[in-house]
Amino acid sequence: MPVTVDEIRALAASLPRSYEAHVRGLVKFRVGQIVFLSIAPDGSRMGCGFPKEFRQAAVDAEPEKFALPSASDMRFNWIHVSLAAIDADEMRDLVEGAWSMVVPKFLAEQYAHEQGYARD
């Protein structure tokens, strides 16, 4: 079942140090001044932090789900995701993964442990 913008916003807002900002009609989530998530005005897709070294493989493997960012944004760790093509678990993985790229490592590890993701 596709995810909704409200589900994405709720998860992103719940992450430590995350806050919502509005820039040129886009809903963005930041930690400090670093954007880790952006939602298209029409709610059809999101852009999120994603490791550059895995980006092309993700697009090649699932082109209905992932798309490369614009040429000017290729220098960033970023990918576009079709919301109609992902479920709640995939959305959670993508949003939490993007967030974990921009927070201090200790905070990402603490969050993972609290969520039951980390090994003891």
Region spans (language model):
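Charge-dense, helix-prone N-terminal extensions
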Residues: 1-120
